[in-house]
């Protein structure tokens, strides 16, 4: 009488397989919530970036929205009569943004010391002004600064008692000195951070009628 052959699995191997299976199940269960959160954050970031990209050509509307955000923050600080240290910090941050917005991407001093040269005569080649901080990033940084500052005004821990006229006077003096230095830098290296008034290339002058 023939007996059916059965494979016998050692107990140690069976225990190892069961333990590995349990570990895989536990690791998959523990990583699932984290993966879901990461996917949610990634989807939100993509959606936010898509909306921001759509606003790039609408310069006027973007700055109108920025002005509205600034006014909302000012009204909030005016009615609560506090959080002046946050306003001062935003002012210092805005001053740094303005300097970066008005500065060229390549420092002229570094170009001269490294052996480069800038066009100093009218006959030299025209070089367009490239900002260190582009206009869109400048706008976005201002929006984010005031939104974060507005949210911080709902927490009393940030309401540090301070005599606000001193902060205002110090900021005005810092703004004056910084802008004077920036203007001197513009005059020294002969660049203008704005496009209006610059020579337009590629356009032919209108023909003039000759009198016979």
From Swiss-Prot:
Could you tell me the keywords of this UniProt record? Acetylation, Membrane, Transmembrane, Transmembrane helix
Q: What is its main location?
A: membrane
Entry function: Involved in the retrieval of endoplasmic reticulum membrane proteins from the early Golgi compartment.
What is the membrane topology listed in the Swiss-Prot or TrEMBL record?
A: Multi-pass membrane protein
Residue positions where N-acetylmethionine is found in the record: 1
Segments traversing the membrane: 55-75, 82-102, 135-155, 157-177
| Protein name per Swiss-Prot or TrEMBL | Protein RER1C
Q: Name one GO biological process term.
A: retrograde vesicle-mediated transport, Golgi to endoplasmic reticulum
Per the UniProt record, one Pfam family is Rer1
The UniProt similarity line reads: Belongs to the RER1 family.
Subcellular location(s): the record lists: Membrane
Taken from the UniProt entry, a GO cellular component term is:
intracellular membrane-bounded organelle
């Amino acid at each position: 009488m023939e007996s059916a052959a059965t494979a016998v699995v050692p107990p140690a191997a069976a225990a190892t397989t069961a333990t590995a299976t349990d570990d895989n199940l536990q690791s998959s269960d523990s990583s699932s919530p984290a993966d879901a959160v990461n996917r949610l954050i990634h989807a939100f970031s993509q959606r936010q970036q898509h909306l921001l990209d759509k606003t790039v050509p609408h310069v006027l509307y973007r700055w109108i929205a920025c002005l509205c955000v600034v006014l909302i923050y000012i009204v909030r600080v005016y009615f609560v009569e506090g959080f002046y240290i946050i306003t001062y910090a935003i002012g210092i941050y805005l001053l740094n943004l303005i300097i970066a917005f008005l500065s060229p991407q390549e420092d002229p001093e570094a170009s001269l010391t490294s052996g480069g040269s800038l066009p100093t005569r009218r006959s030299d080649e025209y070089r367009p002004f490239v900002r260190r901080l582009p206009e869109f990033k400048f706008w976005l940084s201002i929006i984010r600064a005031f939104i974060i500052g507005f949210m911080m005004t709902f927490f009393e821990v940030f309401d540090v008692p301070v005599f606000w006229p001193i902060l205002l006077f110090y900021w005005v003096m810092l703004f004056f000195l910084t802008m004077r230095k920036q203007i001197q830098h513009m005059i020294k290296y002969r660049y203008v951070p704005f496009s209006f008034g610059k020579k337009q290339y590629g356009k032919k002058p209108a023909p003039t009628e000759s009198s016979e």
